């Protein structure tokens, strides 16, 4: 369904209520990335009770696989800019896209599982969400996200970069669900 929305959104007949949201809330198109992240977490080694703490080979393997995602991300940038295809800046920013987001989530999650015991993922997932919400409420992050300044790499890609905390938290939480529901010892 999300794939159809991604293709159909460029046509005038497509109902705007299903298009990506601009500042808050979510729509049918918004849940596509979240579901993809969740599916990746459900089938991950972390969810399957693999011991990864201290395992640098796992981190290296994930990083190698993510190089392909980063290359696809750059190809997407060049293609979109080359054919002058409209790409809403409020989606991910000027240069950011889904492929960079997914690569960062996979690498950061693998790094976390290499450094910490897997039993801490609930705590870390919750802490990331709390920290992000506190930053939105009590720092200038909210104002930064809603201003039109696109000076520098971080400001140009603020939507994609700041979404990483939420996606990493979602990944960790889904790993926990996978471990508890799908892969629990029987």
Stretches with model-predicted labels:
Residues 1-186:
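Alpha-helical transmembrane segments and their immediate juxtamembrane cytosolic regions
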């Amino acid at each position: 369904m999300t794939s159809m929305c991604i293709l159909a959104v460029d046509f005038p007949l497509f109902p705007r209520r299903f298009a990506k949201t601009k500042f808050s809330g979510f729509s049918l198109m918004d849940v596509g990335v979240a579901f993809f992240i969740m599916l990746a977490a459900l089938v991950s080694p972390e969810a399957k009770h693999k011991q990864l703490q201290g395992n640098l080979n796992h981190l290296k393997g994930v990083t190698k696989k993510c190089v392909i995602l980063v290359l696809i991300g750059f190809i997407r940038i060049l293609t979109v800019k080359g054919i002058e295809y409209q790409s809403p800046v409020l989606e991910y920013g000027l240069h950011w896209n889904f492929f960079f987001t997914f690569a960062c989530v996979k690498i950061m999650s693998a790094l976390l599982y290499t450094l910490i015991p897997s039993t801490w993922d609930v705590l870390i997932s919750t802490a990331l969400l709390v920290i992000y919400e506190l930053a939105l409420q009590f720092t200038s992050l909210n104002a930064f996200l809603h201003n039109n300044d696109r000076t520098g790499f971080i400001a140009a890609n603020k939507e994609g970069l700041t979404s990483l905390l939420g996606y990493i938290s979602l990944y960790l939480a889904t790993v926990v669900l996978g471990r508890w529901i799908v892969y629990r010892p029987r």
